[in-house]
Amino acid sequence: MRCRIARAPALGLLQSISTWGNLAAGAIGMGIGLAATLPFGLKPWQAMFIVGALPALMSVFVLAKLKEPQKWVDARAAGLAKGIKFGSYKNLLTHPRWSRNAWWALIACSAGIIGLWGIGNFHPKIVGSIVEGEAAARNLTGPEMASHKAFWRSAGLLFQNIGGFIGMLSMAKLAQTWGRRPAFALALLCSFLSTVLVFKFMRQTTDMYWMLPLMGFGQLGVFGVYAVYLPELFPTSLRSTGTSFCYNVGRLLAATAPFTVSKITAKLGGDIEGFRTAGLWVSLVLLLGIAVLPMLPETKDQPLPEE
């Protein structure tokens, strides 16, 4: 019983901590942007790629120490003895109940992922245009302009993820108190409204201080609901499979968003205003996510489903 009560808060906290890496990246990027020169003639983005590779090496040692939970090991052994296949995409996509949950959740998740990965994470393009305009009056040289833009783009990432951390914690908490579907709907609505705010109205660097945290709150807050809700839609034999399907296929679908934004931008003249408008049009997909939520079950205060 204690594990059941703690599961949702723990998942929400774990998901929110994912922003810490982005916060660190933003702070490091700001430091690189402030540096007068970089070693080996590196450009700011090249230095960030090198720094970003280090955690991947660290994760190898961490993963080597992680072990499967004993409860999962026992459940898998018991399931296999009964002939239950674990991790079967065939079972996931052909079972009447689980396939229904998988497909509708995929649509809802894809909407939120497109909002972040396909639209919101391209806010540095807007930041760059703002910084260029404000820095032109200062007669900065080419290298100075590059460092200035790198600083503010990294600052934007920092602001976004401060809001994202709070958003994930808040939406995960609301999912526990209001219910999964109401929290999901609110998170998608916040994502949509905050995207409109940034893409239409962010025009000065001072706007970044409050608009980007709001966008991070909305767009990343959706992921706090994913962490709590998705595992509750599938049985033990398909829990990670179903969650992975909804999230990772959603990421593949989100990969089409930048191409769509690019095409719309080109149709609208190819300038920054065209890009802003394109982002606004594509953000309408977030409303589709809200529209399909009634097709999914409410799982608040329900035991995890089983075969």
Residue ranges of model-derived segments:
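Transmembrane-helix signature of 12-pass secondary carriers
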Residues: 1-307
